[in-house]
Every structure is written in structure tokens, then in C-alpha cells.
Regions:
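Polar, enzyme-active/binding microenvironments
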Residues: 1-328
């Protein structure tokens, strides 16, 4: 829409931009999440390591636009590992964990402090994948025991409320160690165990089963997925007998196979991944040996990851979320 000449002015008294609608001057309000929060914040919660305890309840955070070591945020209300996460611009939600639990917990991303009880998943499980838009969070797949009882369940929650998850539909396959990312309309689940290169998609605001999107460049279990509103990235993961440092990317609004983006700084799997509108970040993982490394990339470019800093403790199988990802 063209703005008529002279219809915009800056009011020196109120220090606001104003628009003239033909009868009166009106203030133009603006809001950016990054201005309100001091920059997109990435949060890493839970995990498994060897110091100071095997199962960690630690929650760390970073400011994604900077570099440097993570800072302590608080503790998980329910201790475990192999959970996954989703978030709005204000609230982060962590679902499931090992030993298999149906507990969902939440934090307020812009503050610090311990997580609180949100509700329950429809099925106790761990190594599920998570994603969200600004209002709805999804948790998919996972398993209930090391013997390999896997699920294709997709649950959903309304992030701004509390309460139990509800059934959304099913993935195209029964899978664990799956990862997720999203735009504001479409959710993507990729990889998993048993080892697969399959990528599924759903429309977040509806209910129903997932459909096939395409394939990763290689089959991987335990990759870390993150996205802005355009591009989804999948980094690392396990290939039978070894681990991977490969980063793939997709264009979320299309269908098709993933393309090579570059490499992580280390070969590792079971890391947490989160993003702002410009950067993707991976933290922790197993290489072999538990890692505290944090890597980052510029999402709309291609190339290898660069060192960001370190988590407060070494661990893998941790959840990650942000208040600036592609679903918002």
C-alpha cells in the first residue's frame, strides 16, 4: 500500500512515528521480540554425562546473537535425560525423559529459575522429537524402554496454558531419537532410530497424520534440528558404527530431499539444537565422550559450523529451545 506524501511524521515530543489517516494523527506501535528480551535466547535442559552426576537436571542459556560460554538458568523440576523441547516467544516446554516419563515441564525463557510442572504426555516415553509455532507445541515418537518399544505418536499442547497433551496424529514410521524444527505453519520431524533418513511433515494448526517430505542426505539417529522461518537444519547424529558431523538443510515450505550445508566442528550425536532468525546453534553431544561444545552457523548461508563456546557441564541427550526460532 502506498503511503500518501506527508502522511508520516516523527513526533519529537512523544518520540513516536505517527500516521495521518485523513482526520487525525495516530501513533504507529512496533514490537520486536529481540528488543523485548535482549536478543533471542537459547536454552539447553537436562541431559546425561559423567560429571558431576550421570543424569543432569541442569538448565543453561546463551544469547544466540553473541558468542561465549553458557550461563546457569536453573534446574529441571523432573530430573532425566533424552527429553525434547518446544517453545513460544515467552515460554519453553520440555516433554518426556529417561527413565520413561510422561512429565511435561515449562520455564519462562526471558527469566531464570527452575522449571515447573505443565502436565503429562499421552504416553510416557523418551527420545521424542519436539517443535512448535507460537501457540502450539508438538512431541512425536520416542521409546519406553531400551529393548526398543518405539512409538509413532504425535501429541500436542497449547503452550500458553498448562494441562495434559492430546493426540495429534501419527508419524509415518515408528521411531525414536527423532528431531524436529518448524516454520509458523509447518512442522518437520527427521531422522531417528532404527536408523533412517526419512523426513516427515505436518501442518501444526491442524490435526492428522504426518506425510512424507523427503530424505536426509544420510540416515542418522539423534541429529539436532533447528530452523528459522525458511530453512530447517539437521546436524550430527549417529550412523550405525560411527557418528556424523554432517549438517543438512531443507526449505520448509517445499517438499524434497535435504541438501548438504556443511559440517559441525566435531563428529557427535544426541545434542540439543536451537535457533534465532539468523543463527542455528548446537550444544553438547557424544563424540565418543560427553561434550560441552556449542557450535553455530548462519542459517541462510552454507558452510561449516564455528565454535560458539561451552555448556556449563559436558552432557548429551539434552533438550534445547529458543524464543526466536522459525515457528514464531
Amino acid at each position: 500500500m502506498a503511503v500518501p506524501s506527508g502522511a508520516l511524521r516523527f513526533n519529537a515530543d512523544s518520540r513516536k512515528l505517527e500516521y495521518y489517516n485523513g482526520e487525525a494523527w495516530w501513533q504507529i506501535d512496533s514490537f520486536t521480540p529481540d528488543a523485548a528480551t535482549g536478543g533471542a535466547r537459547g536454552v539447553f535442559g537436562g541431559g546425561y554425562g559423567n560429571s558431576p552426576v550421570a543424569t543432569s537436571n541442569t538448565i543453561d542459556y546463551v544469547t544466540i546473537s553473541t558468542t561465549g560460554n553458557a550461563t546457569d538458568f536453573g534446574d529441571c523440576y523432573s530430573t532425566g535425560y533424552a527429553s525434547n523441547s518446544c517453545s513460544s516467544s515467552t515460554r519453553g516446554v520440555i516433554g518426556g525423559a529417561y527413565p520413561a516419563t510422561n512429565v511435561i515441564q515449562y520455564i519462562t525463557i526471558s527469566s531464570t529459575g527452575n522449571s515447573q510442572d505443565f502436565g503429562d504426555l499421552t504416553q510416557a516415553r523418551y527420545y521424542n522429537g519436539g517443535l512448535s509455532n507460537s501457540t502450539r507445541g508438538l512431541f512425536a515418537g520416542g521409546n519406553i524402554n531400551p529393548a526398543g518399544t518405539y512409538y509413532n505418536i504425535i501429541d500436542y499442547i497449547t503452550i500458553a496454558s498448562t494441562g495434559d497433551a492430546r493426540d495429534f496424529g501419527d508419524l509415518t514410521r515408528i521411531i525414536s531419537r527423532v528431531t524436529g524444527c518448524s516454520s509458523s505453519t509447518r512442522g518437520i520431524f527427521a531422522g531417528g532410530q532404527p536408523n533412517t533418513n526419512v523426513i516427515d511433515f505436518v501442518t501444526i494448526s491442524t490435526l492428522g497424520n504426518a506425510a512424507d517430505f523427503g530424505d536426509l542426505t544420510i540416515g542418522r539417529e539423534g541429529p539436532g534440528g533447528c530452523s528459522n522461518s525458511i530453512r530447517g537444519l539437521f546436524g550430527g547424529g549417529g550412523i550405525p558404527g560411527t557418528n556424523s558431523n554432517v549438517i543438512d538443510f531443507i526449505t520448509i515450505s517445499t517438499l524434497g530431499n535435504a541438501t548438504d550445508f556443511g559440517d559441525l566442528t566435531q563428529i557427535r550425536n544426541n545434542m540439543g539444537a536451537c535457533a534465532s532468525s539468523t543463527r542455528g546453534v548446537w550444544g553438547g553431544g557424544y563424540a565418543p565422550g560427553f561434550q560441552n561444545v556449542i557450535d553455530y552457523v548462519t542459517i541462510m548461508s552454507i558452510g561449516n559450523a564455528v565454535d560458539f563456546g561451552d555448556l556449563t557441564i559436558k552432557r548429551d541427550s539434552l533438550g534445547a529451545l529458543s524464543n526466536g526460532h522459525g515457528g514464531l
